[in-house]
Amino acid sequence: MNIRMKRGMALVLTASLLLAGSAQALFGLGKSKPETVSPENGPTARDLEIRTYRGIPYLGQLEAADPDGGELTFAIVTQPKKGTVTVEGTNFTYTPKENAAGGDSFTYSAANSAGAVSLPATVTVTIEKTRSGVTYADTGEATATAAQDLAERGVFTGAKIGDKWYFEPDRTVSRGEFLAMVLETAGAEVTDVTMTGFRDDDAIPTWAKSYAAAGVAEGILRGKPTEDGAVFSCEDPISFSEAATVLNRVLDLGDVELEVWFADREAVPSWAAQAVGNMEALNVLSVGSFGSDRLETAVTRADAARMLSAAGTLLRGEKDTGLLGLLKKS
């Protein structure tokens, strides 16, 4: 895919646009280093790299593999110095201390049902300062970092009402809004157009036409086929299957072996199965956050933020997730 980069582009929705109805796993996919060495026949924990923003908790997932394929439990071995970390199941929450910035780290281990414990793995943390001037009043721990990431990178900014910013994490995302955010995340060059070529061109809002045309030109948008030709259906909610398909075309990182990786593939439409499998393998669309039983439901802003933040990390060149080399088809 040939993405042309352009600086300074942003999709900023004002309060009036948001109120009129116009137009997030994990912030920046946790980057996995090579596996740590573990005792023979025991589990192996992975080193991770994460980033968050000053004063904003990071919700992530610990990673480990066990040769027996059994259930694993996780425990913190050494606590971070610039924050605190808690573990619940496979998920962890890192909370920076007030005004903390810069580097930090903590270690964790994984244990299997037989009592074998891995050697400690290190989670390296970077706490960045916010520069956008945006601090949301309505994002919980699961969404806060991803939503902030989109604002800091000029991809999407919610509404400012009075002196407070609102992300509206439960608000449904339309096909047009998601496409616009994807193209901004990818840094695609978007130019003004008056016609898109879609049969429902008259129903596409002016702000969305340039994104629709760019999506077609870049090969990531094909529309919905009808007897009269393809339609964009800009205002329709976007489903997880559709979102995964668009992101898969943008990332273009190869295909995983579905029979090995994606056990629930038969629950997904055939046209979306490979894309969903690829995105789940990369934790852009992850089991536990977005289970396959939800793939035909509408994406919310919280969902979109987590997906786009993770995809943005990959697009910025951080492609070594520890999974790509193992999961791509030979």
Identify the meaning behind each predicted range.
Residues 1-4:
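N-terminal secretory signal peptides that target proteins for export/translocation
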Residues 6-18:
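Sec-dependent N-terminal signal peptides
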Residues 16-42, 46-54, 124-145, 157-179, ...:
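Feature responds to low-complexity, polar/acidic, surface-exposed segments characteristic
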Residues 37-77:
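Extracellular ectodomain surface segments
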Residues 62, 77-127:
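Acidic, turn/loop-rich segments in luminal/extracellular domains of secretory-pathway
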Residues 150-152:
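Mature N-terminal segment immediately following signal peptide/propeptide cleavage
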Residues 154, 219, 283:
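Phosphate/pyrophosphate-binding loop motifs in nucleotide- or prenyl diphosphate-using proteins
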